[in-house]
């Protein structure tokens, strides 16, 4: 079967950026930035994104482009005879399934809130207790949560079943274009609110006092973690898009564009959140409470809040759904390569698997609310811990070692693939950094995540 390919470079960049851009860009990056010295944190973040995130991104893409296959088969095509690197391909796919076990539920929350604002469920005069109660009611109703999760899964696999160009690429182009327009409109509106500039200053102006209080080591560690996790590396989520790429552009050049889009959305998200919260005297927090309690409380007290709430949750829906369909594509491509299934068969069978696997997360907030797993975490946080703290860093380390050691694919073959085409080239002089320093940085992140 002839390997599918992207219709355009723009399609590849927007699909890949859509995979990287997700909920964490909005509910984590702005908060961590504000708490860790503003502009100083952003500077360290950008340094680590270039020094850590971009190299590993090019490695995943290189494995995909050189092999023209999905996770397991890509290792088999490139590894030396008798070696076992392909075992990680199976682990990477497990990571993709596990990520979707909870990400589909959270993406469903975004869709639910878009329709809640559209219907006018959130009205002026509501306070933080009211918006908290509304979110609590959603979590307490397994049928409602399951409905929105099912909507997300069914729509996601419907998109992917239509093929790479007519499904994933076409929908991602539309969603990412709309997302970028929405984020600019929302940020401009937020910045023009009364008292909003104080929020902008807190968010982006370098704050040496905050850095001194927190400690420069902690700021650097936070920046390193954010830069590493933002691209969702380690579970072959990016590798699959490398397998659909052409050879006309270098991987560092294309990877830099993906990083730039991801960073733009993360920084702009803060320009929506901080000015609005400062304008209405609301304390900024992180995670689900920021998105589903704090910000709705801001919107309901804002002139035209129903419209702005709709636009924000449309943006969040696109941000989360772009990740969902990107990972679904990876899961389907794996099934097509490994078992010879058609796209429709891969979509149907994997759709059923993901629906069943997502049930524990849905029930974890109500029927199974007393169930605590890893370190006392609830179901969603336990699944997230497995993916974010174990599979992503370990997977990134495996891709790195595969690409730069003589026991794997090898540094020279990786560099030749990465530098094929026009654009930004990776210097061969970086070999010692890739072989000795970068693995230690990833190992540090892995150990930090377990402490």
Task: Locate predicted features.
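Transmembrane helix-boundary motif of multi-pass solute transporters/channels
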Residues: 11-48, 236-242, 253-256, 260-261, ...
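Select transmembrane alpha-helical segments in multipass membrane proteins
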Residues: 5-16, 41-44, 83-97, 146-152, ...
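Membrane-interface "cap" regions at the ends of multi-pass membrane proteins
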Residues: 1-27, 56-61, 65-87, 246-250, ...
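C-terminal membrane-solvent junction of multi-pass transporters and transport-like membrane proteins
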Residues: 87-93, 339-351, 382-442
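Inter-helical loop and helix-membrane interface segments of multi-pass membrane transporters/permeases
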Residues: 3-4, 32-36, 66-91, 104-165, ...
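Helix-loop-helix connectors at the membrane interface of multi-pass transporters/channels
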Residues: 3, 73, 107-140, 242-248, ...
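Membrane-embedded translocation segments of transport machinery
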Residues: 2-6, 169, 173-321, 325, ...
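Loop-to-transmembrane helix boundary motifs in multi-pass membrane proteins
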Residues: 5, 11-13, 19, 142, ...
């Amino acid at each position: 079967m002839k390997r599918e390919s992207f219709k355009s470079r723009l399609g590849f960049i927007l699909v890949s950026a859509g995979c990287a851009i997700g909920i964490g860009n909005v509910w984590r990056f702005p908060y961590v930035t504000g708490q860790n010295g503003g502009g100083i944190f952003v500077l360290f973040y950008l340094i680590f994104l270039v020094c850590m995130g971009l190299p590993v991104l090019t490695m995943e893409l290189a494995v995909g482009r050189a092999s023209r296959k999905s996770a397991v088969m890509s290792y088999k095509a490139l590894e030396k005879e008798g070696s076992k690197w392909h075992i990680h391909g199976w682990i990477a796919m497990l990571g993709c399934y596990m990520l979707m076990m909870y990400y589909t539920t959270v993406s469903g929350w975004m869709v639910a809130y878009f329709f809640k604002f559209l219907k006018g469920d959130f009205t002026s005069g509501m306070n933080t207790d009211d918006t908290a109660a509304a979110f609590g009611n959603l979590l307490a109703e397994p049928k409602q949560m399951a409905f929105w999760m099912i909507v997300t899964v069914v729509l996601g696999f419907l998109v992917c079943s239509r093929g790479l160009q007519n499904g994933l690429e076409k929908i991602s182009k539309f969603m990412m274009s709309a997302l970028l327009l929405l984020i600019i409109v929302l940020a401009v509106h937020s910045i023009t609110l009364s008292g909003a500039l104080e929020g902008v200053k807190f968010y982006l102006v370098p704050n040496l006092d905050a850095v001194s209080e927190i400690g420069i080591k902690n700021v650097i560690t936070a920046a390193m973690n954010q830069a590493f996790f933002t691209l969702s590396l380690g579970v072959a989520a990016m590798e699959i898009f490398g397998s659909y790429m052409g050879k006309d552009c270098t991987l560092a050049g294309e990877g830099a564009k993906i990083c730039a889009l991801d960073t733009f959305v993360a920084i702009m998200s803060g320009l929506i959140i901080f000015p609005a919260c400062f304008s209405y005297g609301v304390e900024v927090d992180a995670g689900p409470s920021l998105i589903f309690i704090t910000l709705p409380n801001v919107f309901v007290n804002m002139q035209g809040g129903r419209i702005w709430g709709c636009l924000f949750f449309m943006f969040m829906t696109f941000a989360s759904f772009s990740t969902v369909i990107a990972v679904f594509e990876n899961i389907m491509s794996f099934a097509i390569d490994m078992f010879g299934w058609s796209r429709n068969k891969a979509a149907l069978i994997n759709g059923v698997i993901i629906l069943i696997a997502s049930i524990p997360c849905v029930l974890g907030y109500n029927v199974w609310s007393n169930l605590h797993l890893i370190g006392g975490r609830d179901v969603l946080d336990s699944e997230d811990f497995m993916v974010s703290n174990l599979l992503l860093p370990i997977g990134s380390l495996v891709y790195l070692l595969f690409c730069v050691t003589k026991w794997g694919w090898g540094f020279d073959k990786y560099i030749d693939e990465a530098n094929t085409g026009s654009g930004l080239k990776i210097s061969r002089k970086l070999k010692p950094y890739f072989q000795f320093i970068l693995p230690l940085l990833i190992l540090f992140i892995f150990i930090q995540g377990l402490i």
